[in-house]
Regions:
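N-terminal helicase ATP-binding lobe
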Residues: 1-122
Length: 122
Protein backbone atom coordinates (compact mmCIF):
# COMPACT_ATOMS: atom_id res chain seq x y z
CA UNK A 1 0.00 0.00 0.00
CA UNK A 2 1.00 3.64 -0.23
CA UNK A 3 0.83 6.57 2.15
CA UNK A 4 -2.14 8.05 0.28
CA UNK A 5 -4.02 4.73 0.12
CA UNK A 6 -3.44 4.13 3.81
CA UNK A 7 -4.48 7.67 4.78
CA UNK A 8 -7.47 7.94 2.40
CA UNK A 9 -10.10 6.67 4.88
CA UNK A 10 -9.34 9.68 7.10
CA UNK A 11 -9.83 12.20 4.26
CA UNK A 12 -13.00 14.32 4.53
CA UNK A 13 -14.74 16.81 2.23
CA UNK A 14 -15.91 19.69 4.45
CA UNK A 15 -17.52 22.56 2.56
CA UNK A 16 -16.41 26.03 3.66
CA UNK A 17 -19.11 28.29 5.03
CA UNK A 18 -19.18 31.69 6.70
CA UNK A 19 -18.67 30.16 10.13
CA UNK A 20 -16.82 26.94 9.33
CA UNK A 21 -13.47 26.10 7.76
CA UNK A 22 -13.53 23.81 4.77
CA UNK A 23 -12.77 23.44 1.11
CA UNK A 24 -14.17 26.04 -1.27
CA UNK A 25 -16.73 24.92 -3.88
CA UNK A 26 -14.22 25.33 -6.74
CA UNK A 27 -11.74 23.13 -4.88
CA UNK A 28 -14.34 20.42 -4.26
CA UNK A 29 -15.37 20.57 -7.91
CA UNK A 30 -11.77 20.19 -9.09
CA UNK A 31 -11.11 17.29 -6.70
CA UNK A 32 -14.22 15.46 -7.90
CA UNK A 33 -13.44 16.24 -11.55
CA UNK A 34 -9.97 14.73 -11.17
CA UNK A 35 -11.43 11.64 -9.53
CA UNK A 36 -14.07 11.32 -12.26
CA UNK A 37 -11.45 11.64 -14.99
CA UNK A 38 -9.43 8.74 -13.64
CA UNK A 39 -12.45 6.48 -13.14
CA UNK A 40 -12.66 5.94 -16.88
CA UNK A 41 -9.26 7.03 -18.16
CA UNK A 42 -5.62 6.43 -17.46
CA UNK A 43 -4.13 9.30 -19.46
CA UNK A 44 -2.88 12.48 -17.79
CA UNK A 45 -5.36 15.10 -16.72
CA UNK A 46 -5.00 18.86 -16.37
CA UNK A 47 -6.57 20.98 -13.66
CA UNK A 48 -6.71 24.68 -14.48
CA UNK A 49 -7.64 27.12 -11.74
CA UNK A 50 -6.97 30.85 -11.23
CA UNK A 51 -4.19 32.18 -9.04
CA UNK A 52 -5.14 32.06 -5.37
CA UNK A 53 -7.96 29.56 -5.83
CA UNK A 54 -6.33 26.75 -3.89
CA UNK A 55 -4.62 24.63 -6.54
CA UNK A 56 -2.05 23.25 -4.11
CA UNK A 57 -4.77 21.96 -1.78
CA UNK A 58 -6.52 20.38 -4.78
CA UNK A 59 -3.27 18.79 -5.91
CA UNK A 60 -2.65 17.23 -2.50
CA UNK A 61 -6.30 16.22 -2.00
CA UNK A 62 -6.32 14.52 -5.41
CA UNK A 63 -3.41 12.34 -4.30
CA UNK A 64 -5.56 11.10 -1.40
CA UNK A 65 -8.72 10.65 -3.46
CA UNK A 66 -6.86 8.79 -6.21
CA UNK A 67 -4.92 6.79 -3.60
CA UNK A 68 -1.72 7.64 -5.43
CA UNK A 69 1.26 5.38 -5.02
CA UNK A 70 3.69 8.16 -5.78
CA UNK A 71 3.27 11.79 -6.81
CA UNK A 72 5.55 13.84 -9.03
CA UNK A 73 5.05 17.58 -8.88
CA UNK A 74 6.89 19.76 -11.36
CA UNK A 75 7.06 23.41 -10.38
CA UNK A 76 7.93 26.35 -12.63
CA UNK A 77 10.28 28.03 -10.16
CA UNK A 78 12.34 27.49 -7.04
CA UNK A 79 9.93 29.60 -4.98
CA UNK A 80 6.87 27.62 -6.07
CA UNK A 81 8.75 24.33 -5.59
CA UNK A 82 9.62 25.31 -2.01
CA UNK A 83 6.07 26.46 -1.24
CA UNK A 84 4.53 23.24 -2.56
CA UNK A 85 7.10 21.04 -0.81
CA UNK A 86 6.37 22.80 2.49
CA UNK A 87 2.63 22.43 2.00
CA UNK A 88 2.84 18.73 1.14
CA UNK A 89 5.24 18.00 3.98
CA UNK A 90 2.93 19.59 6.57
CA UNK A 91 -0.54 19.15 5.00
CA UNK A 92 -1.30 22.44 6.76
CA UNK A 93 -4.01 23.70 4.41
CA UNK A 94 -5.94 20.42 4.36
CA UNK A 95 -5.70 20.23 8.16
CA UNK A 96 -6.92 23.85 8.54
CA UNK A 97 -9.80 23.08 6.19
CA UNK A 98 -10.78 20.05 8.25
CA UNK A 99 -10.16 17.65 5.38
CA UNK A 100 -7.55 15.89 7.55
CA UNK A 101 -7.22 15.60 11.31
CA UNK A 102 -4.49 17.65 12.97
CA UNK A 103 -2.66 14.47 14.00
CA UNK A 104 -2.53 13.04 10.47
CA UNK A 105 1.10 12.20 9.71
CA UNK A 106 2.51 13.84 6.59
CA UNK A 107 3.97 11.98 3.62
CA UNK A 108 7.68 11.82 2.92
CA UNK A 109 8.66 14.59 0.55
CA UNK A 110 11.79 14.72 -1.56
CA UNK A 111 12.70 17.74 -3.63
CA UNK A 112 15.25 17.69 -6.38
CA UNK A 113 16.80 20.63 -8.13
CA UNK A 114 18.11 18.65 -11.09
CA UNK A 115 16.62 16.40 -13.71
CA UNK A 116 15.91 12.81 -12.82
CA UNK A 117 17.63 10.89 -15.60
CA UNK A 118 17.16 7.25 -14.63
CA UNK A 119 14.61 4.86 -13.19
CA UNK A 120 16.97 4.20 -10.29
CA UNK A 121 17.02 7.86 -9.34
CA UNK A 122 13.22 7.93 -9.38
Amino acid sequence: MSYFSDAYPAFRYPLKSDDQAGLRPAQLGAIHAAAAHFVTRNDPGVITMPTGSGKTAVLIAAAFVLRARRVLIIAPSRLVREQIAEEVSTLATLKRAGALAEDTPAPRVHTTKTRITSAEAW
